[in-house]
Amino acid sequence: MVTYLLANFGGPRTSQEIVSFLQALLTDRDVTGGMIPSVLHRPLFSYIAKRRAPHVARQYAYLGGGSPIFQDTERLAQNLSQELQASVIPFHRYLPETHRETLQALQESQGSIVGIPLFPHYTFAVTGSIIRFFLQHLPEKPISWITQFGVHPQFVSCMQQHIRDCLAAQQIAVEDCYFLFSVHGLPQRHIRLGDPYAQQCQASFEALRGELEGEIAFQSKFGIGKWLDPSTQEVCQSLRTKKRYIVIVPFGFVSDHIETLYEIDHLYVPILLQKEYRVVRIPAINASSRWVSSLAAIVRSSPQETSLEPLLMP
């Protein structure tokens, strides 16, 4: 008997969870640990989280006060459970209010556990953080992990068809489009530590782009230091093309959340509109029936990692 652990980023369901969400995220040393000495880390970033909460709350107000990522992940877990005919337990990494229920369900599970982080590309700061969480909180339950799927044929074909369907629904010809494939950025210091994220993103982009005209860019920078480039904002500012449409494809996100619904729509799209382009943001694949069946095929065919130390931030 196999139990599947479906792990996603998590997000505040209501405005009341914004502070705890930010504290869980910013005090995670896999995310921000390289910036300051460990003794100062938790108190400083707890303070920063509280200071940033009102600003972030105004962004979430555009989404109705909370993120849809929780419900989308729960729905995907239910649908994937039906597809796999097995138990699928959802996990929301930075929604601490849900952790006890997840840990209890895993503790009571029988047989092996396979972890499925919903991130196409592996990075110490996200998938590595999820793996570390369970090594710390559930050490008696070994979990094998599917650590990336960005070039898996099922993911590539699902995304390509999703893009075509979205454009066809708006009667937009692919030939009239320039594609901006946007993925979450990462500090370059992580790459110097051996993080494979940039290489995996590039390979995934090349597989997805195929014959389309476009480029890759990195969004969502925060904090100090140099990040992967070019940034999505810089590309939007410098972009010159004769194509009528700019199509933004957030291919590193399988769920819509603040970085697609607010950041792209409110920070990047206006730059392109001012340049008189027509702009389309491709929605994330979320819990669509095509993605459910594709994800099930990925789960059935992907190798599982059991040697976990190399997967963690050094």
Swiss-Prot record:
Residue runs in coiled coils: none
Keyword presence, Disulfide bond: no
Top-tier EC class: lyase
The protein's Enzyme Commission number: 4.98.1.1
Entry-linked Pfam families: Ferrochelatase (PF00762)
Cysteine pairs bridged by disulfides in the record: none
Family under the similarity heading: Belongs to the ferrochelatase family.
Role noted for this protein: Catalyzes the ferrous insertion into protoporphyrin IX.
Record-given protein name: Ferrochelatase
